[in-house]
């Protein structure tokens, strides 16, 4: 909760999946098709940046039958030494959850599975032992409450909020970047719960894409191409810019491509 030393962005390991050639079929609200070759370049740079941040990479094989499978954050959540398998909203992604369970459960002490409702990792913001779950088109009330009950039983506290309309995932336009400091878009800055409990750094209209940044240890990975965001963050943080244009075509951001702990 606010006011406590933050360990949320202190990591030693990351799970990442190799890109799949079928990614051009990934879910996209924009109906755009990313280039596999360009995704490969982004992915390579992403891994390099995470390794430079001091993390050991666990690299999973690509899954051609699952176009969205490179985005490993959605079907699973890590808390303490537990892995929680989530329940993605689109039926095409349910198989991903089962597969990633079999691939990574050996790295964790306990495995839990959310069986009721729909919930995706992109709607879950972790801040120490506190979680904010955003209701969205991908995460419904039953899924949020099911996960909330599970996390509470593991010692966490949870707040369920409504994601603003037309934002795909709660974290599409916000990210934890420091102790109790959340980087937000103009729309996310209006959420009463965030305003009341955290220090917000609000990005200007037009730079919403930079709000999904990724704090890893002493570095802050920031989507490239957002000039004002860079100016706001450069003096306060050790930023690394990463081109995410191609994954943005399928509504994805920096946090989507890894599970970190």
Residue ranges, per PLM feature:
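The feature marks the mature, well-folded catalytic cores of soluble enzymes
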Residues: 2-261
């Amino acid at each position: 909760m606010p006011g406590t030393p933050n360990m949320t962005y202190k990591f030693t390991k990351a799970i990442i999946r190799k890109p799949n050639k079928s990614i051009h079929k990934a879910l996209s609200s924009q109906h755009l098709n990313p280039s596999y070759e360009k995704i490969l370049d982004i992915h390579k740079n992403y891994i390099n940046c995470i390794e430079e941040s001091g993390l050991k990479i666990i690299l999973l094989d690509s899954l051609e039958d699952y176009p969205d499978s490179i985005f490993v954050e959605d079907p699973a959540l890590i808390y303490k030494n537990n892995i929680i398998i989530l329940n993605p909203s689109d039926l095409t992604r349910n198989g991903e959850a089962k597969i990633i369970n079999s691939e990574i459960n050996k790295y964790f002490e306990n495995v839990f599975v959310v069986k009721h409702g729909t919930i995706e990792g992109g709607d879950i913001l972790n801040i120490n032992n506190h979680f904010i779950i955003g209701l969205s088109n991908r995460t419904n009330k039953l899924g949020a409450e099911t996960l909330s009950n599970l996390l509470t039983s593991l010692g966490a506290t949870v707040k369920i909020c409504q994601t603003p309309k037309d934002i795909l995932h709660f974290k599409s336009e916000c990210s934890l970047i420091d102790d109790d400091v959340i980087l937000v878009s103009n729309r996310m800055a209006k959420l009463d719960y965030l305003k009341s409990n955290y220090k917000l750094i609000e990005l200007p209209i037009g730079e919403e894409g930079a709000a999904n940044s990724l704090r890893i240890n002493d570095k802050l990975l920031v989507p490239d191409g957002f000039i004002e965001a860079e100016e706001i963050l450069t003096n306060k943080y050790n930023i690394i810019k990463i081109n995410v244009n191609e994954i943005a075509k399928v509504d994805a951001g920096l946090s989507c491509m890894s599970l970190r702990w």
